[in-house]
Amino acid sequence: MSRVSTSMTVNASLAEVWDYYFDPEGWPAWVDGFGRVESSTGYPEAGGSLRWVSGRAGRGEVTERVLEHEPRRVHRVAFQDPETEGELNVAFAIEGDGTLVTQELDYRLRRGGPLAKLTDRLFIRSQMRGSLARSLGHLKLEVEEVAAAGAQPL
């Protein structure tokens, strides 16, 4: 398995960040490559599942199964798409007047081959890291805008 991670401090309360993170109406604005929800059963609670599809240039159909959900602390899912599978762990913590959000992605390529490890190391890992960073960057912008306006999340 390969691992990538990124962290970002959002200038908003833990409650605001947590609530926005799990609001599906906001996902198109911040989840990298997100298209639409196909189905959701019990999500985001432990044991729940989510199936979503990306936009044209994205990952295709993505399925998630919630492994752990501790309100305002951690959310961990097992995921699978046509090219990869693994786990995404998201941790939330108060940091000063804001909220530190950390995403750790453990993944493996579903299709092997003699050059799979090299391809991952040279190309795919940086794309995965970039996707996490884009998502958190957009989450930060969206939540801070909502918090600054004094409005409730979507």
Named regions from a protein language model:
Residues 11-15, 67-72, 91-100, 146:
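A short, structured loop/turn motif at beta-sheet edges
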Residues 19-32, 47-58, 127:
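Short, solvent-exposed helix-to-loop capping segments enriched in aromatics
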Residues 34, 38-39, 137-154:
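Short, highly charged C-terminal tails/helix-capping segments
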Residues 49-55, 75-82:
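Short beta-strand segments that buttress and anchor functional surface loops
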Residues 78-134, 141, 150:
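Beta-strand/loop substructures that line and gate deep hydrophobic ligand-binding cavities in soluble
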